[in-house]
Amino acid sequence: SDPGDSVRAGQHEDINLITLLMGASAEGLEVLNKQGEWVGITAIPGSLVVNVGDMLQRLTNGYLKSTTHRVVNPPKEKWSEPRYSIPFFLHPVGKMPLNALAQCISDTRPRAFDDITAGDYLNERLVEIGLKKN
């Protein structure tokens, strides 16, 4: 059937520190660039794609931005082909503070996020997106 404008995974940022992506079996991964345009990403064979997650964004006080990404459907001629991807989500231990690193705070870049532990932040976000009840 025709998937129309549907996407395989809607626009989002990962909650964790970083996500490592080994080469997917088919195209479809797109990232949102600074100009607000979706750009297709294909891993170079033998390499990884690294997505910055929300936790790393907090630690760096926004110096490193979470990667906004999605997975779109392939062109019509490839609809019947499966797409496999092996993401590795790196999460810190729950008690790790996600406080902004001192070297990432300045007079021109004040603290952007409240202090919180990784576990509390993960729980907060999972409740926020409806994957966990409070």
Each language-model region and where it sits:
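C-terminal flanking tails of non-heme Fe-dependent oxygenases
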Residues: S1-N134
